[in-house]
């Protein structure tokens, strides 16, 4: 590309020009015995039940709310109890968890005044109000108040 005089001048000032290599034609031969690189495995899971974990937290400090959100992010059902949390921190914890619930498209259910259940979006939690009322009247599951 460059003539000899230009090349010498550029070499003198410290710039080296490399010749572009002409592309060589490479002949491709297909190996008859080679397996395709992107072979997808054919796996069928039979009889594997959904294994959903339930995590229970008895929170005492606001700093512990991160554990609830981390468990929810891992698609675990989380039950958390706020009975031992100072009154001024309860609303902050509920707000924090509510933000995580919104971001992760999860659901939060109030079990009692200070006990909540948070479920990931892949899980439906249905509460039968009639059954809940029956339990309350009989004193079964006192936390359902």
Swiss-Prot record:
Native organism: Caldicellulosiruptor bescii (strain ATCC BAA-1888 / DSM 6725 / KCTC 15123 / Z-1320)
InterPro entries assigned: Cell_div_SepF (IPR023052), Cell_div_SepF/SepF-rel (IPR007561), SepF-like_sf (IPR038594)
Location (main, coarse): cytoplasm
Identification of the protein by name: Cell division protein SepF
Free-text function comment from the UniProt entry: Cell division protein that is part of the divisome complex and is recruited early to the Z-ring. Probably stimulates Z-ring formation, perhaps through the cross-linking of FtsZ protofilaments. Its function overlaps with FtsA.
Comp. bias intervals (Basic and acidic residues): 23-41
BP-aspect Gene Ontology terms: division septum assembly; FtsZ-dependent cytokinesis
Ranges for region Disordered: 23-42
Keywords for this protein: Cell cycle, Cell division, Cytoplasm, Septation
GO-annotated cellular components: cytoplasm
Bridged cysteine pairs (disulfide): none
Location in the cell: Cytoplasm
Presence of the UniProt keyword Cytoplasm in the record: yes
């Amino acid at each position: 590309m460059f003539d000899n005089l230009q090349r010498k001048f550029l070499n003198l000032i410290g710039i080296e020009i490399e010749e572009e290599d002409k592309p060589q034609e490479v002949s491709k031969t297909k190996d008859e015995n080679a397996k395709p690189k992107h072979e997808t495995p054919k796996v069928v899971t039979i009889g594997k039940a959904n294994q959903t974990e339930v995590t229970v937290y008895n929170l005492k400090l606001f700093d512990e709310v991160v554990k609830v959100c981390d468990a929810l992010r891992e698609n675990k059902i989380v039950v958390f109890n706020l009975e031992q949390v100072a009154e001024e921190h309860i609303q902050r914890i509920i707000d924090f968890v509510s933000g995580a619930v919104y971001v992760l498209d999860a659901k939060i259910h109030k079990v009692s005044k200070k006990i909540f259940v948070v479920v990931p979006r892949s899980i439906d939690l249905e509460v039968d109000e009639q059954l809940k009322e029956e339990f309350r009247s009989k004193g079964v599951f006192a936390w359902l108040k």
